């Protein structure tokens, strides 16, 4: 991107927190004064102290992007996580389901008039599950450098030239790559790693496609293919070295009642003595 875009993004990211962020409880206020009047030290809220779901989405995603793409100011990740914590704590209705349209500054739901509803012309699933989807992508692929699996069920002949594009979002060029593909639970190798395009085979029925996208240069990944009767079946990819072994251990520790493992090493490149001994 142009350097001017980066500069402007940083200007906005640095200006918003002192003006519109609740630095005590997390989250972003609905409406704030844009300027300070003579003698004022703090930006004033307009009409009320409510926090709307839309501002939380924009704030959370913006700061995850800034943290993941530039990684030059630790406060960007802090603002993203504080906003996430407030949203998860107060905007989700854990009893009846759904997302509140508005809450007060302290998190109490604001349920008056048209804002008591959880869906409207300006609030839909696009705004709620999009936040979950993109926040997971940015935090995993860009911030914490964790691989992610995505699932598709394309109809036969439903895509031009049978090309299935699986990039989850517009991410910085070269930051992620398509590492592995499975079709109907079987490894599949006809795909473009950097372009993240799967060349689908001819079929007369919908295909079950699973892809693993990971940060570029990750070096190793362990993917759980199935877990039945205490046996976990994993597909390993890359180089299993002493430094990468904790990644494999982490995946194993997620399973309760594990009694044995079966390992698919088709995509393994190397494994050192530490890996073999483990």
What are these regions (language model features)?
Residues 218-235:
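Short beta-strand/loop segment at the start of cytosolic alpha/beta domains
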Residues 239-278:
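Amphipathic alpha-helical interaction surfaces in cytosolic regulatory modules
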Residues 24, 236, 273:
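Short glycine/serine/threonine-biased micro-segments
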Residues 181, 209-211, 222, 234, ...:
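Hydrophobic beta-strand residues in large extracellular and virion-surface proteins
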Residues 207, 235, 269-270:
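Secondary-structure boundary/capping motif
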Residues 1-217:
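Glycan-recognition and catalytic cores of secretory/periplasmic carbohydrate-active enzymes
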Residues 55, 229-230, 257:
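Residue-level preference for short coil/turn positions at secondary-structure junctions
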